[in-house]
Amino acid sequence: MRYPEASSPLSSRQVREELGGADAVIVALDELDAAAISAGRNLKVIAKHGVGVDNIDVGRAALGGITVVNAPGMNSTAVADLVMGLLLALQRKIVDAHNSLLEGRWERFHGPELVDRTMAILGFGRIGHEVAKRAHGFGMRVIAYDPFLAPAEFERAGVERCEEIDAALAEADVVTLHLPSTGTGPLLGGEAIGRMKPGAVLVNAARGDLVDEDAVVAALRDGALAGYAADAFAVEPPVGRPLLTAPNVVFTPHIGAFTDHANELMGMSVVEDILAVLSGRAPRHPVIIKD
């Protein structure tokens, strides 16, 4: 067993150097492209310590007879907690107030309350449901968009269903993203951001490429967007990106799933599935390629 020590995700080259004769590999945000997978001459199973597999070439793995597994549902509460933390930090200017106090100032920072405001959740899966519970606890009205869910699912959660993304954007004071990568470019580009309610804020704790970060910067600077909070970025780490110097932002380094409880659940899940594959049994959480 090898456990590379690194402060940031490993590149494809670094992964290739580490794989050697490994039968299994567990990755978080490390890059497993076709070249890295091909370097794993004995590789039988790739386990994602998380849910999204956009950093893994699942198609190349399938061609090589390599099983890919993930850990769905294990980090839902952890991510939902962080979403609300980011939102509160953004709205109540907690980071600005903290930094101001450390610099010796005693400033009063004003911001909106969440009660009676409307949150739009784009992508109403496990995490979206958990975010809705927390938003309801703050007295928010919650609307959601998810084309793959039956209307009854929204009703059970006490959430209003939006049939189109644009309808959700136009109504919401807060928009939070919980969708997989589109693979075809940003879901929210300049035009979509322009259709958001004036003074709205955007939270992205899903995938960095869901938003056009340059469009976000422009909207923040001209005041069309009141704030942006993110735990995911188009390039990670986002060193030197214009987004980092934009006004009214709060960021975390992709730590949505990083709680003790979530890490334990995900770790146990992927280890159990690795052992299943290596012993010839079917894993509980295989990643299936959709046509």
What is the predicted function of each stretch?
Residues 68, 199-291:
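Rossmann-like dinucleotide-binding domain for NAD(H)/NADP(H)
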Residues 124-125:
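Glycine-rich Rossmann-fold phosphate-binding loop(s) that bind the pyrophosphate
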Residues 34-37, 147-242:
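Rossmann-like adenosine-cofactor binding region
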Residues 64-66, 72-118, 130-137, 283:
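Phosphate-binding beta-alpha-beta segment of Rossmann-like dinucleotide-binding domains, i.e.
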